[in-house]
């Protein structure tokens, strides 16, 4: 259905992730935790994790398994960002489409809907989820991420929109 929007979606994702941090998830670079990086085979200092390695991890662990390439670009980005950052993106998209289908079946169910209605409803569900989480010190960052995603998602375009 959609073209390969991974490079563009990854660039937008990196605008959300930034660089090196240490938080409850441990040492993280480009949104990749040390645990994930080590499982991938990275042995260096986390501060020096190459962005290319983060891109390879993102594609293999979050883009391909969630079949993001099957969805219109604005939906693919929301799905990808949520899979990467945490949440229940497939469950939320199934709820919006009123289906239990996954992969190509879910993409087909969503393809007959207005892309921007799907994006809006998806982000409403994501905000509800984020509001329910503990660690209120991260609330502003989470809300800013959603705001950026809605704005950035508007810059994505493909033939399916």
Q: What name fits each language-model region?
A:
Residues 1-161:
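Cell-wall polysaccharide-cleaving catalytic domain and substrate-binding groove, primarily
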């Amino acid at each position: 259905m959609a073209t390969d929007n991974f490079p563009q979606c990854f660039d937008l994702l990196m605008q959300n992730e930034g660089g090196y941090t240490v938080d409850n998830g441990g040492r993280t670079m480009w949104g990749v935790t040390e645990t994930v990086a080590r499982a991938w085979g990275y042995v260096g200092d986390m501060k020096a994790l190459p962005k290319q390695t983060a891109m390879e991890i993102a594609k293999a662990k979050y883009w391909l398994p969630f079949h993001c390439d099957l969805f219109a670009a604005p939906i693919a980005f929301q799905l990808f960002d949520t899979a990467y950052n945490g949440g229940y993106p497939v469950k939320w998209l199934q709820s919006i489409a009123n289906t239990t289908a996954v992969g190509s079946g879910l993409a087909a169910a969503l393809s007959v809907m207005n892309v921007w209605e799907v994006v809006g409803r998806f982000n409403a569900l994501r905000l509800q989820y984020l509001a329910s989480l503990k660690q209120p010190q991260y609330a502003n960052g989470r809300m800013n991420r959603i705001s950026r995603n809605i704005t950035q998602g508007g810059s994505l375009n493909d033939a399916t929109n």
